[in-house]
Curated annotation (Swiss-Prot):
Tissue expression as described in the entry: Expressed by the venom gland.
The keyword Signal is annotated on this UniProt entry: yes
Protein name (record): Three-finger toxin MicTx3
UniProt keyword terms in alphabetical order: Disulfide bond, Secreted, Signal, Toxin
GO CC, alphabetical: extracellular region
Keyword presence, Disulfide bond: yes
Taxonomic lineage of the native organism: Eukaryota, Metazoa, Chordata, Craniata, Vertebrata
Amino acid sequence: MKTLLLTLVVVTIMCLDLGYTLVCYTNVLEPPGTLETCPDDFTCVKKWEGGGRRVTQYCSHACAIPASYEFVHCCQTDKCNG
């Protein structure tokens, strides 16, 4: 009986995926930025201008739409926007 109860608890925790968060780099001017823990429904974003000038890293609800002179990389794994 104890084994069955323990098995149910383990399966419940695995199914709920408790406490998962996303870790992204964040900065304003110069990479690499500091690490920020974002909610699991967020995405990591890295945005830069052509020629590599001015790189911005942050967490967002959605991927940014780049202007004609920008490049954007969005991803959903830890530290992927470095």
